[in-house]
Amino acid sequence: MIERYTRPEIGAVWTDEARMEAWRQVEVAACEEMDGPTPQDLEAIRAATFTVEAVKEREKVTDHDMAAFVDVLSASAGPGGRWIHYGLTSSDVLDTALALQIKRAGEIIRPGTRACPAG
């Protein structure tokens, strides 16, 4: 995105931080629907954190953005982190997270389209 042509609130949807936060939301939601994690595991998974810097540093080792993210998030969750990404593919997470980002962008843009004249 070219910053000078981007509304700040739209640009914020597409940052690395926002993208990885969407990944985190997908991973947490998937864990919440599994039968395996204990309530303690889920509590730790929900509380798990990441930083973009930590993920990028780990990516230097993994050569894979999602693998790096999963490693960082899982480590943050402790033993319960073993359930993060369990049964998922990278595409499962990436595609679903992208849909969340598109939805957020639409929620920002939509009110402005109502002000446009028809036709």
Q: Model-derived features: where do they sit?
A:
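A helix-coil-helix interface module used to build multimeric assemblies
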Residues: 1-119
